[in-house]
From Swiss-Prot:
Domain notes: Consists of three domains: the N-terminal catalytic domain, the editing domain and the C-terminal anticodon-binding domain.
Protein name as it appears in the record: Proline--tRNA ligase
Keyword field contains ATP-binding: yes
Domain of life of the source: Bacteria
Database matches in InterPro entries: aa-tRNA-synt_IIb, aa-tRNA-synth_II, aa-tRNA-synth_II/BPL/LPL, Anticodon-bd, Anticodon-bd_dom_sf, Pro-tRNA-ligase_IIa, Pro-tRNA-synth_IIa_bac-type, Pro-tRNA-Synthase_IIa_type1
Organism listed in the record: Fervidobacterium nodosum (strain ATCC 35602 / DSM 5306 / Rt17-B1)
Subunit structure: Homodimer.
Cellular localisation: Cytoplasm
Family: Belongs to the class-II aminoacyl-tRNA synthetase family. ProS type 1 subfamily.
UniProt KW Aminoacyl-tRNA synthetase keyword: yes
Length: 574
């Protein structure tokens, strides 16, 4: 491809709304353009990378015998109502009506639709197991789309679904996907971890995430030297419950003006923040729930949703709380509240003489105690497990790293097949619900994750496996000899099957070099004054520089050797 014919509009300045490196660099380097919040056009460079990611994913799916299909984006509401997720999925689901007033959704995922498909196609155990997958656009109305393609409202996803007649078969397919997804990470060239995860709104009884490490990631991976790893939404807290050794004091209501957080309350009252019990109100299918956690810990919403078996659970709005409880959100507490289920973290059980909201603006209760002053309906593990907490396997302190979730696999069991009446006939002639697995991979998110992990101050550093071009040939001027050799080299490398960009633009060499670094092409061949000495300069995007004899064969051979040694994670400073 000649740069003069290629649409790659690079920018000198970062977009004002860029929050993370991938959003800035993919925009500046001409890979994407923002159309609306969370909605992007992929320009030719971006599309080339996406196609390579898709190719790797497709090859790994082919290797495990999965079958590619393509399902519609628009899905009828009836299917989601059958599974119970029309309401459970929450406000992230994009809903619409057709001209006849019928409800539809722009599919955020396709469990319901694929289950409906197979119930009309598969009717015997002899047709099982089978795995179907697609790569298609998905839609989720994120409350705050952010981080460019990492958290978008429209995104490209590979979603796969397997159907089985027994759990052993599901186990085999689950393991095959786990290996295939690890292969995808390794073939792309990302540093990653496979972690235990929460199943969330998808459901199921076993789940793993494939997380690419990145400082800007929204996933918090906890791992231990024993080999255990889990998403902090999933990792149980197994620390010791500390029982306060003190006499019970009389409860009092005290004036606490202008305090908003647990730390504010602790500072105002002169007590440790762990002596504060935070009260959080959630609203679900069955009304309100009150959750209590120590002031020095955070509530884990996924744990609460799983404990209550209600994925529709959402944090109550300040307006709802003021309307239904008559108190501002910062002064809620369990004392004197009736008609609401109270669930406390296990750590609250050991606390004595703690502080809670006074159910009146600018007031808190001090010296509060469970059982004497209010009742807890149920105890549960509700807190976010964090770095330094004990490993649930060996008890040693956990370490933490940030990451970006790219893949997620689930053992769904019979959740969807039972809800939708999807059954097959077993060998005894009995109708049984399909046992299912689900396997997702964020294709467009992978584009952003690579850049988050592999970039420097000059731009992107693409791994060879997904780079839009492997080589850029850069003549430093339009001098006849330089251009003639550059054209010959370009044609020779193209004939050899190389993906080459010839920068034939009539601009300064500095601008060409800057664009090559910004775009992130692994190898740059500079055709300049060294040609008069029979040499060209080759620079790797990772910084290494070489002089190579200016013959077509020697340049080609050097590039082949460079491909074997090039590692985008090993950069040199110049």
């Amino acid at each position: 491809m000649r740069f003069s014919q290629f649409y790659a509009p690079t920018l000198k300045e970062a977009p004002a709304d860029a929050e993370v490196p991938s959003q800035e660099l993919l925009t500046r380097a001409g890979f994407i353009r923002k159309i609306a919040a969370g909605v992007y056009t992929y320009l030719p460079l971006g599309r080339r990378v996406l196609l390579k990611i898709e190719k790797i994913v497709r090859e790994e799916m082919d290797n495990i015998g999965a079958n590619e299909i393509l399902m519609p984006i628009i899905q009828p509401a009836e299917l989601w109502k059958q599974s119970g997720r029309w309401e459970d999925y929450g406000p992230e689901m994009m809903k619409l009506k057709d001209r006849h007033g019928r409800d539809f959704t722009l599919g955020p995922t396709h469990e319901e639709l694929v289950t409906f498909l197979v119930q009309n196609e598969l009717n015997s155990y002899k047709q099982l197991p089978i795995t179907l997958y697609q790569m298609a656009n998905k839609y989720r109305d994120e409350i705050r789309p952010r981080f460019g393609v990492l958290r978008a409202r429209e995104f490209i996803m590979k979603d796969g679904y397997s159907f089985h007649s027994d759990w052993e078969s599901l186990d085999e397919t689950y393991k095959a996907h786990r290996k295939a997804y690890s292969n995808i990470m390794e073939r792309i060239g990302l540093k990653y971890a496979v972690v235990e995860a929460s199943s969330g709104a998808i459901g199921g009884n076993e789940s793993h995430e494939f997380v690419a490490f990145a400082d800007t990631g929204e996933s918090n991976v906890l791992f231990c030297e024993c080999g255990y790893a889990g998403n902090d939404e999933r990792v149980p807290y197994t620390g010791e419950i500390i029982y306060d050794n003190e006499e019970l004091k009389g409860m009092e209501k005290v004036y606490t003006p202008n305090v908003k957080t647990a730390q504010d309350v602790a500072d105002f009252l002169g007590v440790p923040v762990r002596k504060i019990v935070k009260t959080l109100i959630y609203k679900g299918r069955n009304g309100y729930f009150m959750a209590l956690v120590p002031g020095d810990r955070e509530l884990n919403e996924e744990k609460l949703k799983n404990f209550l078996n209600d994925q529709s659970l959402a944090f109550a709005t300040p307006d709802d709380i003021l309307k239904d409880f008559g108190v501002p959100i910062g002064f809620l507490g369990p004392v004197g509240v009736k008609g609401i289920k109270v669930i406390a973290d296990h750590l609250v059980k050991g606390m004595k003489n703690f502080v809670v909201g006074g159910m009146e603006k600018d007031y808190h209760f001090v010296n509060v105690n469970v059982d004497r002053d209010f009742k807890v309906d149920e105890l549960a593990d509700l807190i976010v497990t964090r770095e330094g907490d004990p490993c649930p396997v060996c008890g040693k302190p956990l370490n933490a790293k940030k990451g970006i979730e790219l893949g997620h696999i689930f053992k769904l069991g019979t959740k969807y097949s039972e809800a939708m009446g999807s059954k097959y006939m077993d060998k005894d002639g009995q109708l049984k619900p399909f046992i299912m697995g689900c396997y997702g991979w964020g294709v467009s998110r992978t584009l952003g994750a690579i850049v988050e992990q592999l970039h420097d101050e000059k731009g992107i550093i693409w791994p060879l496996s997904v780079a839009p071009f492997a080589v850029v040939i850069t003549p430093v001027s339009n001098n006849e000899n330089l251009m003639k050799f550059s054209e010959e080299l370009y044609n020779f490398l193209v004939e050899k099957g190389e993906e080459v960009l010839l920068d034939d633009r009539n601009i300064s060499p500095g601008m060409k070099f800057n664009d090559a670094d910004l775009i992130g092409i692994p190898f740059r061949v500079t055709v300049g004054k060294a040609l008069s000495e029979g040499m060209v300069e080759i620079k790797w995007r990772t910084g290494q520089q070489f002089k190579v004899k200016a013959t077509l064969e020697e340049i080609y051979e050097f590039l082949q050797k460079s491909k074997q040694e090039y590692d985008p994670h090993k950069r040199v400073e110049k």
